[in-house]
UniProtKB/Swiss-Prot annotation:
Reaction(s) catalysed (UniProt annotation): Mur2Ac(oyl-L-Ala-gamma-D-Glu-L-Lys-D-Ala-D-Ala)-di-trans,octa-cis-undecaprenyl diphosphate + UDP-N-acetyl-alpha-D-glucosamine = beta-D-GlcNAc-(1->4)-Mur2Ac(oyl-L-Ala-gamma-D-Glu-L-Lys-D-Ala-D-Ala)-di-trans,octa-cis-undecaprenyl diphosphate + UDP + H(+)
Species, as recorded: Streptococcus thermophilus (strain ATCC BAA-491 / LMD-9)
E.C. number: 2.4.1.227
UniProt family annotation: Belongs to the glycosyltransferase 28 family. MurG subfamily.
GO molecular function: undecaprenyldiphospho-muramoylpentapeptide beta-N-acetylglucosaminyltransferase activity
Residues involved in UDP-N-acetyl-alpha-D-glucosamine binding: 198, 289
Keyword Cell wall biogenesis/degradation: yes
Gene name per UniProt: murG
Keyword Zinc: no
Membrane topology of this protein: Peripheral membrane protein
Name of the protein this chain belongs to: UDP-N-acetylglucosamine--N-acetylmuramyl-(pentapeptide) pyrophosphoryl-undecaprenol N-acetylglucosamine transferase
Amino acid sequence: MAKSKKIVFTGGGTVGHVTLNLILIPKFLKDGWEVHYIGDKHGIEHEQIDKSGLDVTFHSIATGKLRRYFSWQNMLDVFKVGWGILQSIAIIAKIRPQALFSKGGFVSVPPVIASKLLRVPVYVHESDLSMGLANKIAYKFATTMFTTFEQSKTLVKTRHVGAITKVGMTRFDNSDQLDKIKEQFDEKLKTVLFIGGSTGAKVFNDFISKTPELIENYNIINISGDSSLNTLERHLYRVDYVTDLYQPLMDMADLVVTRGGSNTIFELLAMKKLHLIVPLGKEASRGDQLENADYFERKGYARQLQEPELSWETLKHELEQLVEHAETYKEAMAKSEEITSPDDFYNLLVTSISNK
């Protein structure tokens, strides 16, 4: 009797640490793998797995936040991480998987360490130009770390694969909701979509609310992350969260204003969408979005605007520059070789696991 194939996924805290897992899991299931997921039952990873309806066994563990600064909470979280490692050892020892795949986030650290201790191959994916703290730890225990960006040659366990995105051919959804949105929009105006990651961006939400010039000069789509803002009125559609409408709304947009998260900006690259990046600053993050934005600007894929400089005048100028030089930006995006299909990455991952 053939040995059953089993794989454990981990990663969470934000949608960005779950998205790739949700792309890969159906492929493993289709090929007959038994799939497990280790995460926090209160985290977005459990919510997303549950919502997906996929045949995945979810295992919840204790998690502690990894901080780069001093906090008394660090003392308590050391014990939480330790307990999470012990829980992960028990879970993984019982499953006996062929591999563990981690997409990062603080919840991934205990399963990664546990897998290494149990001699289970560990495969990690890093989306950003520089590693987050969780993946810096994970790298030490990894068999291979796949990266979106080229990394230093001193990081011998990394393998550059480019961005893995499921965005492909444009889909059109002729839903009633889409028709209602179009009725409120002016065909003579450019449509600008604001997207701020999995939880929206308060700075975009507040800016749209306080800048009437926006809806006088553009059709505005605001994916806000805040259901209290939901509205459909003249030149303005605000929605907290979208699934089926995501691609149709992107199709409607002439321009996109986004944060600098790797998943989103590479999706925009794959769709060849003109976009302006307003990255999170170092005061609110580790600076990864600033690095991503600099990289995209250097490559000629996008323009960037720092959050403290965001105003009606600066935004209008940046959007006008994107429109004026649209062909240059679209040509640079068309020449990009930084996108990897999910099928190609899946085949690479399965081959790597099989060779261990």
